[in-house]
Amino acid sequence: MTPTIVEFLFDFGSPNAYLCHKIIPQMAANTGAQFEYVPILLGGLFKLANNRSPVEAYAHIPNKLAYERMEMQRFVSKHGLTAFQRNPHFPVNTLHIMRGAVAAQKLHCFERYVDTVYASMWERECNMADPQVIAAELDAAGLDSQAILATSQEPEVKARLLTNTQ
């Protein structure tokens, strides 16, 4: 029987995507499904759908945002995701790190790149919009930041991210 393949469209700037990333291995083990990670630009997707992020859309509704935070905390507690921290730099411009994800696919270091960037963003509270911080975090994880950042500037990589987003 052919396993179910689930496309996981993600942007590192979404705390919900981080939380999903953390439980995907268990979901895969429980169901036999395979998860295909697809880097996108969430802000671009919101624009294409003529929509806004929940933080922006519900900024004037304090109870809605408070409830969202409460539900997120319930999820974190239920799944034992104690490393999760709200990033003080949120919302973060993720263009560099999302292009980096496509570059990491091309360079065959995608899984480690994804784990590193998610941990940097949502566990270590790093400003992952800053290219110097990005390079330092990748280097600390044993990844070749120079190769990833250089590859992320290639027209093919930029085009793939846009295609993924559409």
Language model regions located:
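C-terminal cap of thioredoxin/glutaredoxin-like
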Residues: 2-34, 38, 102, 109-112, ...
